[in-house]
């Protein structure tokens, strides 16, 4: 017989005894495992021989967590590549975090820039009232209390700075306040980063009055330690918005915390407002699109 395989077994699977089948399966299971080890060793040897620019491109295609948790443990060469700037600059470029051809000298720590950029988002929940007062704490309902209204509202204007913003919080004839406390570690920012690098923490808020009534507005932001001691603070003080000021237009207030020292674990954001004419209803300061960002 000139066919492939053993002529006694080809085309006759029914003649194989039950005792022989487990042995054949066991042998088949052992061979792939050995083969996998050989293939892995061959692949590692091949990668180790790659020129550095090519190896960097191979590594840059892997998830960041695998690079830090696994690849840097493979060998000294890989550890140096994972800890170095060129790999993370390449990942930043590939994922659109920096323009192609970015200059390496622009930053000292591209790995840190990468992880901060991937985490970058508004850390405040429900900043525009889409979920009523959900996510806000220490809510003070002075006068008739807070109310969520649709833009532009009575005697107000549209919020042209961000088309996605559709609502705002309106305050009343006595002070209305609300706050949020952000746990930075729970949001993915680790102790060493906060204590050593101290990335910039940027706070922004938008407020407005009505064209038919004056109002007061205030913003206070505190950086707190693990035991809620105040390590840094910003306060706008009471800002008076006179009647007919900018036709009820929206104004931005912002502050950037830098070099705030080690130990910061929480950010407490609090703002509030009231009207200055003491009219029943919701003639006080309006707030929306509040934000807290940790910048790369």
Swiss-Prot record:
Q: Quick one: which pathway?
A: Protein modification; protein ubiquitination
Compositionally biased region (Acidic residues) = 16-40
Which InterPro entries does the record associate with it? Answer: F-box-assoc_dom, F-box-like_dom_sf, F-box_dom, F-box_only, Galactose-bd-like_sf
Entry membrane topology: Peripheral membrane protein
Q: Which domain of life is it from?
A: Eukaryota
The record's Gene Ontology cellular component field reads: cytoplasm; cytosol; dendritic spine; endoplasmic reticulum; extrinsic component of postsynaptic membrane; glutamatergic synapse; SCF ubiquitin ligase complex
Biological process (GO), any one = protein modification process
Question: How would you summarize the oligomeric state and partners of this protein?
Answer: Component of the SCF(FBXO2) complex consisting of CUL1, RBX1, SKP1 and FBXO2. Predominantly detected as heterodimer with SKP1; the heterodimer with SKP1 is not part of the SCF(FBXO2) complex.
Q: What is this protein called?
A: F-box only protein 2
């Amino acid at each position: 017989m000139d066919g492939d395989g053993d002529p006694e077994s080809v085309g006759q699977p029914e003649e194989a005894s039950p005792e022989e089948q487990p042995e054949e399966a066991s042998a088949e299971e052992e061979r792939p495992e050995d083969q996998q080890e050989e293939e892995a060793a061959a692949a590692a040897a091949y990668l180790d021989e790659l020129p550095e620019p090519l190896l960097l491109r191979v590594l840059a295609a892997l998830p960041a967590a695998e690079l830090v948790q696994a690849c840097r443990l493979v060998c000294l060469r890989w550890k140096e590549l994972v800890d170095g700037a060129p790999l993370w600059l390449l990942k930043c470029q590939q994922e659109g975090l920096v323009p192609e051809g970015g200059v390496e000298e622009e930053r000292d720590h591209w790995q840190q820039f990468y992880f901060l950029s991937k985490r970058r988002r508004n850390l405040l929940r429900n900043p525009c009232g889409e979920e009523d007062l959900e996510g806000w704490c220490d809510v003070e309902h002075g006068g008739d209390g807070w109310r969520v209204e649709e833009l532009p509202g009575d005697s107000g204007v549209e919020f042209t700075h961000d088309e996605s913003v559709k609502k705002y919080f309106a305050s009343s004839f006595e002070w209305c306040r609300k706050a949020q406390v952000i746990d930075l570690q729970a949001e993915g920012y680790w102790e060493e980063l906060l204590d050593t690098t101290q990335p910039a923490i940027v706070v922004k808020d938008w407020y407005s009055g009505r064209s038919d009534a004056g109002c007061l507005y205030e913003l206070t932001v505190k950086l707190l330690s693990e035991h809620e001691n105040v390590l840094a603070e910003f306060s706008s003080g009471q800002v008076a918005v006179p009647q007919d000021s900018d036709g009820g237009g929206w104004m931005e207030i912002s502050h950037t915390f830098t070099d705030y020292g080690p130990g910061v674990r929480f950010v407490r954001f609090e703002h509030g407002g009231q009207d200055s004419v003491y009219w029943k209803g919701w003639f006080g300061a309006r707030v929306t699109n509040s934000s807290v960002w940790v910048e790369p």
